[in-house]
From Swiss-Prot:
Signal peptide: none annotated. It comes from Brassica napus (Rape). This is Peptide methionine sulfoxide reductase. Has an important function as a repair enzyme for proteins that have been inactivated by oxidation. Catalyzes the reversible oxidation-reduction of methionine sulfoxide in proteins to methionine. InterPro entries: Met_Sox_Rdtase_MsrA_dom, Met_Sox_Rdtase_MsrA_sf, MsrA_MetSO_reductase. The modification Phosphoserine is found at residue 244.
Length: 257
């Protein structure tokens, strides 16, 4: 038996009524329009992530090198010599031994030390604030500047305090304090200070099992820290528990915020 399958009728625009013809043309026109494109490349995320230098994880964890100066932002003043003058018959020395609160108290207790100040040095930005230094973008170290009478206390004795106060083998770190601002450093004002510092480091290296990472460099511009940082632990700090700054005191130093 022969079966006949009828093909579906072909509908053309001609066979449509005028209203349907208009609708079909409109649909065809829409289909030919260019599809909107994303302003972001296919391989890029549509969310922009700002990467600040202060968020350099390796540097902030103490594994990276200290920030390098941007020639456009660096200051010749900041990298120049410390132009402050000690009192007559006195000498200056700068030490970086972790948090400057504890380092200052250690030197306040030394007979022959006539003045201590904490501040920022060895960076490349002029007039940094504490917040600037904490951002890890200025290159500064937390410093205690010691004024001492060389007739009463030797520079070697000040170096002894320095080595005992911190661990000179940990790069950019002292305990829980991490960052390049906590790096170990001796910053000299005279050739004699440099000579004694290097000799002392050689002796310490023979005692310690790990390599000393202390930097020994000429003292540069010293920026005095904000007043609330000065003699912080002797004044009681945030906890209001003052610690003795009496000369010769050997009480443990508790460095709390």
């Amino acid at each position: 038996m022969l079966s006949i399958v009828a093909s579906p009728p072909v509908i053309s625009a001609v066979s449509l009524s005028k209203p349907l013809q208009s609708l079909a043309k409109a649909a065809l026109s829409l289909s030919k329009r260019a599809k909107p494109t994303s302003p972001f490349p296919k391989t890029a995320r549509s969310i922009s992530v700002y990467k600040s230098p202060m968020n350099n994880l390796f540097t902030r964890l103490g594994f990276g090198s200290r920030p390098q100066p941007d020639p456009a932002a660096s200051s010749a003043i900041a990298q120049g010599p410390d132009d402050d003058v000690p009192s007559p018959g006195q000498q200056f020395a700068q030490f970086g031994a972790g948090c400057f609160w504890g380092a200052e108290l250690a030197y306040q207790r030394v007979p022959g030390v006539t003045k201590t100040e904490v501040g920022y040095s060895h960076g490349f930005v002029d007039n940094p604030t504490y917040e600037d230094v904490c951002s890890e973008t200025t290159g500064h170290n937390e410093i205690v500047r010691v004024q001492y009478d060389p007739k009463e206390v030797s520079f070697e004795s000040l170096l002894d305090v320095f080595w005992k106060r911190h661990d000179p083998t940990t790069l950019n770190r002292q305990g829980n304090d991490v960052g390049t601002r906590y790096r170990s450093g001796i910053y000299f004002y005279t050739d004699e200070q440099e000579k004694l510092a290097r000799e002392a480091m050689e002796k310490q290296q023979k005692i310690l099992n790990r390599k000393i990472v202390t930097e020994i460099l000429p003292a540069t511009k010293f920026y005095r820290a904000e007043n609330y940082h000065q003699q912080y632990l002797a004044k009681g700090g945030r906890m209001g528990l003052s610690q003795s700054a009496e000369k010769g005191c050997n009480d443990p130093i508790r460095c709390y915020g």
